[in-house]
Curated annotation (Swiss-Prot):
<keyword id="KW-0678">Repressor</keyword>
<feature type="domain" description="JmjC">
    <location>
        <begin position="307"/>
        <end position="452"/>
    </location>
</feature>
<feature type="binding site">
    <location>
        <position position="418"/>
    </location>
    <ligand>
        <name>Fe cation</name>
    </ligand>
</feature>
<feature type="region of interest" description="Disordered">
    <location>
        <begin position="67"/>
        <end position="122"/>
    </location>
</feature>
<dbReference type="GO" id="GO:0045892">
    <property type="term" value="P:negative regulation of DNA-templated transcription"/>
</dbReference>
<feature type="compositionally biased region" description="Low complexity">
    <location>
        <begin position="76"/>
        <end position="86"/>
    </location>
</feature>
<feature type="region of interest" description="Disordered">
    <location>
        <begin position="185"/>
        <end position="210"/>
    </location>
</feature>
<feature type="compositionally biased region" description="Basic and acidic residues">
    <location>
        <begin position="87"/>
        <end position="96"/>
    </location>
</feature>
<dbReference type="Pfam" id="PF21233">
    <property type="entry name" value="RIOX1_C_WH"/>
</dbReference>
<keyword id="KW-0539">Nucleus</keyword>
<feature type="binding site">
    <location>
        <position position="355"/>
    </location>
    <ligand>
        <name>Fe cation</name>
    </ligand>
</feature>
<dbReference type="GO" id="GO:0005634">
    <property type="term" value="C:nucleus"/>
</dbReference>
<dbReference type="GO" id="GO:0016706">
    <property type="term" value="F:2-oxoglutarate-dependent dioxygenase activity"/>
</dbReference>
<keyword id="KW-0223">Dioxygenase</keyword>
<dbReference type="GO" id="GO:0005730">
    <property type="term" value="C:nucleolus"/>
</dbReference>
<dbReference type="Pfam" id="PF08007">
    <property type="entry name" value="JmjC_2"/>
</dbReference>
<feature type="modified residue" description="Phosphothreonine">
    <location>
        <position position="137"/>
    </location>
</feature>
Amino acid sequence: MEKVTNSAAAKPQGNNKKQESAYNGAGKDKKKPNLDIETTDSDLLSDMHLDGTTEQKVGTLFSKVFEDTDYGTGPSTSSKEAAAAKTADHERRLQAEADVNNNDAEKAGQLAKESVATQGASATERKQAFSLGLEHTSPIQVNGAALACPLVRKSLPPGEANSCPPPPKRDPAAVKSAVKIIKVKAPEEGNNNNDEKEMSTETSEPHKTDSVEEGRRVVMWIIFPIKTKFFFKYFWEQTACLVQRTNPKYFQSLISFKMLDEILIRHNLDFTVNLDVTTYKNGKRETLNPEGRALPPAVWGFYSEGCSIRLLHASAYLTRLREVCTVLQEFFHCKVGANMYLTPPNSQGFAPHYDDIEAFVIQVEGRKRWLLYDPPKEADHLARISSGNYNQEQLGKPIIDEVLSAGDVLYFPRGTVHQAITEEQQHSLHITLSVYQQQAYANLLETLMPMVLKKAVDRSVALRRGLPLHTFQILGNAYKANDCGSRQLLVENVQKLVAKYLMPSEDDIDEAVDQMAKKFQHEALPPIVLPSEEVRTVHGARSGADDQGNCVCDYKFNEKTSVRLLRANILRLVTEPDGSVRIYHHVDNGLDYCKYEPYFMEILPEKAKAVELLISAYPYYLTIDQLPLKSSARKVEVATALWEHGLLMTEKPFK
């Protein structure tokens, strides 16, 4: 391995065998376990200076992800409250359906008027301007008790929320929806569930797991009890999917109100760059970001005024959330984004719009009403670019109108118009996981066809010949009515050139996919190395000095050492147009989006076969003497270089 430079890619290849999970597991005992450590909200926050003990705490918590869910504990008091709230919602909808079925139009109309009146009465407007002063930093309070903000600042006066009246509730009978609503109840203790066991499988050997399979397990955890195959066959890129649970603690380890306050204190976040303050009132969407650092008094001041808070790239500050994203990116083979949204009661932060991502809305705290609409035009289905804001008058009937409570998940495809409003007595904290942005066939063709054209032009003189002199006089919109023979002949000639020279070969497609995979390597989050993996990688290596002052490393490779890639998608082997061979990887990427230039190693072409074998062998180990290189010294050299860059892991620790 010669040159080490900064510049991005990795789509794995190989046999992805089903492995046991190192990340997701709750053991087979359905009773809630007693953890050996105490984990507070602050333990779940990312800190550049965490010591090994804290890192181990976080790792242990991640492996116990299912032990605090429906599958391990059964309904709690808060679960019963959430279930009661859902029952009330259901009864309200049944009543509305009965009104419609009985043709009781007057009664149904009265219910709608009462709903609008209640919402309007609670949507009081503050006339004073937004301020960063301490006089506006209090939480929303009712009769002196904090209702929306768990961080009560008693020394400050109460503030009233700016709110946006939500659209009137539609009769469910009038909503023709293709949405499948899955309502989930927590499994009872002692109930043997094969799916639950599959998700809860633990292993004492995480260094032998398959990272793609681990990603599938996290997807399974998010959408449980829906099977992943069923989800991708009937919902993915097709229609929305709602999973409702009775366990409000299902996602509590990802983030909390208190964690956000700690993030604001511990990290230097800037408005606009890291955090947005938004509001949607009277049909107008505004971003109220001041300049400078987003300090807690300023942020909570905006929140107490009824503004929504959006934390961008939340995985950079939350270790547990980053673990989820790094595992998911192995499954989806693309960047996994995570934004956090905090909305006070009776408020709306964003206008109706659609996005260019597949969205998983994870409700962590509180409740929020979501309204989804079909894409306005056929061209907006599976949109490649996010839309602007829509007026309420531009929207048709919603395909779904449901309230998400803590523990619920809502998936919808890109191009789905959506808006969300909090209820009068409930704040909302949710995370949106975004995947598959710019991952369409169109993106592949945008990369592929310029490459194909360039190669064809270099090979064929026919494409380099000049256009006929009369081309501008017979072709163009103004000349469509000119049905002369020379016009038709020129059109046919262009079509023949395209058919003959611009059909991509298999090699062309491989090259284009490699270029797209480079982009993933640049955007991906760096992997989180588990403790059992650390002792098998360069991250656990230590060096010292002998009596003469010479550096002594605590590792040494030989032909019998067994190695494999750290992750299935940890690197991408790319042959560049100039013929150079590079290994792009994301081991050293920053936590912020594309913080650094892409990382790569440039290698000799004859060494590429060794890397290809490591890719195809994953998730299995192979000995260094199996690498297809001529000499033993060259085999050890290649393996050592890859290991020292954090790309390989040994089967056994050196110590």
